[in-house]
């Protein structure tokens, strides 16, 4: 893979690209990284690259030097990425995607930014490394290079480690331990010595979920309700049992129609609304009516096909902001839950 970095401070990259894993990868030929100075394409005797904006404070990089710098290294299959706080947030998924590009051109921002005409003409994508502002885009470019390099064959000594790291499956990693077995009275969990690889994997997954929920609730929500068709690749939408042979509709009065639609879309994994109607099953529909004066709470009965579906229903309901109420008496899995408008859903599952 080839990467060209365009900035006003090409020497900024010298040490990081000579040391550590990146330096070794470059020496071995797995990576080729060049740093170019945009000032080489500056205008006039003094190689001017910046000027005052027509409206606003500070200075801007001028369009002509930036465009010329990009075009000097651009090829047919090049992808130009501008490091900007306005861009898409960098993720493990995006890093993996970029690692497949044969040639990347990374454009570093400076001053107050870059003339919009240069961006519109040459940039394919804008990427941000976080919701904060740096003195320039060089540090962001290094972060991006380091993140994507891990997915290039030959960069890491053990490529499997890249597949198992935090965020690769959308979750944080669990804890790691090495010798000694006991340190200052704290022991390594016994399960790691059991020899049962499946039990250990299940334990790691459980701890990973718990850690993500505690430390990064945003990632936890995205794992279950994010961009993997909402449910994740391994899960299907919740299946409700429809006992009535007739078409059945539930009508709920809500204060905030938009908020309620979002809640139920995520809850049932269904994005397509027919106006204010959402089809929950083959014969069951949910209608929402916005009103400022609700006449009272509606009680809805839902029976799920499996106990696993019952548990997932409650977990998702709570994570999306709904409230869990009383647990039913007896052996039947039964629970009352309340939606964002106080309507009561009585949830149970089929007994087999």
From Swiss-Prot:
Keywords: Cytoplasm, Methyltransferase, S-adenosyl-L-methionine, Transferase, tRNA processing
Record has S-adenosyl-L-methionine as a keyword: yes
Binding site for S-adenosyl-L-methionine: 109, 129-134
BP GO terms, sorted: tRNA N1-guanine methylation
CDD domains assigned: TrmD-like, VOC
Predominant cellular place of this UniProt entry's protein: cytoplasm
Pfam hit, one: tRNA_m1G_MT
SUPFAM superfamilies: alpha/beta knot, Glyoxalase/Bleomycin resistance protein/Dihydroxybiphenyl dioxygenase
Matching InterPro entries: Alpha/beta_knot_MTases, Glyas_Bleomycin-R_OHBP_Dase, tRNA_m1G_MeTrfase_C_sf, tRNA_m1G_MeTrfase_TrmD, tRNA_m1G_MTases_N, tRNA_MeTrfase_TRMD/TRM10
Enzyme Commission designation: 2.1.1.228
Subcellular location: Cytoplasm
Family classification: Belongs to the RNA methyltransferase TrmD family.
Quaternary assembly: Homodimer.
Entry protein name: tRNA (guanine-N(1)-)-methyltransferase
Organism: Chlamydia muridarum (strain MoPn / Nigg)
Gene behind the chain: trmD
């Amino acid at each position: 893979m080839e990467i060209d970095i365009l900035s006003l401070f090409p020497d900024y990259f010298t040490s990081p690209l000579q040391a550590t894993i990146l330096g070794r990868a470059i020496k071995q030929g797995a990576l080729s990284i060049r740093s170019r100075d945009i000032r080489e394409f500056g205008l006039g005797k003094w190689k001017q690259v910046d000027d005052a904006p027509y409206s606003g404070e500070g200075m801007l990089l001028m369009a002509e030097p930036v465009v010329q710098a990009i075009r000097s290294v651009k090829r047919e299959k090049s992808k130009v990425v501008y490091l900007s706080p306005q861009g898409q947030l960098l993720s493990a998924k995006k890093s993996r995607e970029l690692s497949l590009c044969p040639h990347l051109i990374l454009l570093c921002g400076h001053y107050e930014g870059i003339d919009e005409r240069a961006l519109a003409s040459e940039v394919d994508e804008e990427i941000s490394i976080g919701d904060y502002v740096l003195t320039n885009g060089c540090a962001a470019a290094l972060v991006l290079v380091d993140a994507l390099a891990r997915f290039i064959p030959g960069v890491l000594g053990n490529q499997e480690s890249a597949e198992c790291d935090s965020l690769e499956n959308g979750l944080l990693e669990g804890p790691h331990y090495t010798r000694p077995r006991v340190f200052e009275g704290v022991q390594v969990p016994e399960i790691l010595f059991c020899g049962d690889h499946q039990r250990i994997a299940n334990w790691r997954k459980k701890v990973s979920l718990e850690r993500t929920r505690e430390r990064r609730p945003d990632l936890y929500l995205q794992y279950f309700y994010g961009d993997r068709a909402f449910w994740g690749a391994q899960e299907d939408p919740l299946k409700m049992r429809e006992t009535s042979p007739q078409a059945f509709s539930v009508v709920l009065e809500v204060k905030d129609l938009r908020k309620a639609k979002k809640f139920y879309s995520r809850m049932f994994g269904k994005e397509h609304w027919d106006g204010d109607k959402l089809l929950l099953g083959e014969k069951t529909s949910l209608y929402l009516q916005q009103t400022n004066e609700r006449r009272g709470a509606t009680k809805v009965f839902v029976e799920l096909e499996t106990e696993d579906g019952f548990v997932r229903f409650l977990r998702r309901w709570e994570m999306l902001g709904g409230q869990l109420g009383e647990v039913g008496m007896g052996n039947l899995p039964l629970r009352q839950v309340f939606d964002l408008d106080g309507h009561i859903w009585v949830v149970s599952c089929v007994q087999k």
